Amino acid sequence: MIKAVLFDVDDTLYPSSKLAEEARRNAIRAMIEAGLETDLSEEELYRELQEVVKEYGSNHPRHFDLLLRRIGADPEPKLVAAAVVAYHDTKFAYLKPYPDVIPTLMQLREMGFKLGAVTSGLAVKQWEKLIRLGIHHFFHEVVISEEIGVEKPNPKIFIEAARRLGVKPEEAVYVGDRLDKDIRGANRAGMVTVRIRRGKYQDMEPRNDDDVPDFEIDRPRELLDVVRELAKD
């Protein structure tokens, strides 16, 4: 019997990849407007920034300093500050959940399910997202990789989330967008898995049996039919 529903955060509850791209592009424009001298175009600078993010990880605190050094420019505080302000202004202005997320979370709570979030990243950053999205209060538990010491797809983070919610892994449904992180890890933990086809990874194909979800949906409200069907078992 299903007793809990757990969610990934980025690109599952809000358009993370799209928002990050727009914020980074605006940061590039802000540096140019602040006086960055370079022969590279905006698009070339964006590609260089993407390489920095890929190499150092999305949580590195000094992406823009690294970008400037990468292109042979002096990382002047003015340029870095302009990029940081533009980046955060963009993210904060447009950080909103997908339209059907809040009604779905409300209905799941009304149906009596315990709700949880399982996400990789820095704890403060992930909590900030949930609070700014206005959805943190829906979750009984939020489990973040930095606090646990392992990241998806390690099944330990999913098992810990189930433990905190007071349910067995097989009594939990997990919803996420990435087959190689969300679905693989939750499957290995023994949960019922639901892939939501949204964002950057919507066309990803399974690499092995662990990447195959039990269900696929296109939007959160379709999850309600899934849990109703599972409740019959």
UniProtKB/Swiss-Prot annotation:
Catalyzes the dephosphorylation of D,L-glyceraldehyde 3-phosphate in vitro. It comes from Methanopyrus kandleri (strain AV19 / DSM 6324 / JCM 9639 / NBRC 100938). Keywords: Hydrolase, Magnesium, Metal-binding. It holds the Pfam family Hydrolase. InterPro entries: HAD-like_hydrolase, HAD-like_sf, HAD-SF_hydro_IA, HAD-SF_hydro_IA_CTE7, HAD_sf. The keyword Hydrolase applies. This is Glyceraldehyde 3-phosphate phosphatase. It is an enzyme of class 3 (hydrolase). PANTHER family: GLYCERALDEHYDE 3-PHOSPHATE PHOSPHATASE (PTHR46470:SF2), N-ACYLNEURAMINATE-9-PHOSPHATASE (PTHR46470). NCBIfam families: CTE7 (TIGR02253), HAD-SF-IA-v1 (TIGR01549), HAD-SF-IA-v3 (TIGR01509). Its cofactor is Mg(2+). One of its GO terms (molecular function) is metal ion binding. The keyword Metal-binding applies. Belongs to the HAD-like hydrolase superfamily. Its EC number is 3.1.3.-. Transmembrane segments: none annotated. GO terms for biological process: small molecule biosynthetic process.
